From Swiss-Prot:
InterPro entries: E6, E6_sf. Belongs to the papillomaviridae E6 protein family. It comes from Human papillomavirus type ME180. The lineage of its organism: Viruses, Monodnaviria, Shotokuvirae, Cossaviricota, Papovaviricetes. Forms homodimers. Interacts with ubiquitin-protein ligase UBE3A/E6-AP; this interaction stimulates UBE3A ubiquitin activity. Interacts with host BAK1. This is Protein E6.
């Protein structure tokens, strides 16, 4: 992996890094900033499409694997949670339409699509303020959490 000593020349998005290194998302090799393990192909795509930033340590570009992202997102939630509000309240507080707000998933940190924000509004789910930013749940994390709750309930029933 190439070294980037000058911060002004560093690409901070994975597709930009690939262009700089003259490679593709499919062929790039990058390590996790937390566990130092090489990201698997699916994790590279999830990192890129999650619109997350590449970080640099001693000029070496690093990303984050999915297990570390989920782990540190939970730590962030536990440490920095401050409040929960409904979508209509969030629009009132910020004086901005819900669709214009930048909201990420609280579990995997991907940006929420307009459809995912609308799902929160229609099902009367709250957005959570964590570390100064409002978060919700993406479609994938929303459905996987529901399945986990169902499995838990089925296991405890006699």
């Amino acid at each position: 992996m190439a070294l980037f000593h000058n911060p002004e020349e560093r690409p901070y998005k994975l597709p930009d890094l690939c262009r700089t290194l003259d490679t593709t998302l499919h062929d790039v090799t990058i390590d996790c900033v937390y566990c130092r393990r090489q990201l698997q192909r699916t994790e590279v795509y999830e990192f890129a499409f999650g619109d997350l930033n590449v970080v640099y340590r001693d000029g070496v570009p690093l990303a984050a694997c999915q297990s570390c992202i989920k782990f540190y997102a939970k730590i962030r939630e536990l440490r920095y949670y401050s409040e929960s509000v409904y979508a209509t309240t969030l629009e009132t507080i910020t004086n901005t339409k819900l669709y214009d707000l930048s909201i990420r998933c609280m579990c995997c940190l991907k940006p929420l699509s307009p459809a995912e924000k609308l799902r929160h509004l229609n099902s009367k789910r709250r957005f959570h303020k964590i570390a100064g930013n409002f978060t919700g749940q993406c479609r994938h994390c929303w459905t996987s959490k529901r399945e986990d709750r169902r499995r838990t309930r089925q296991e405890t029933q006699v």
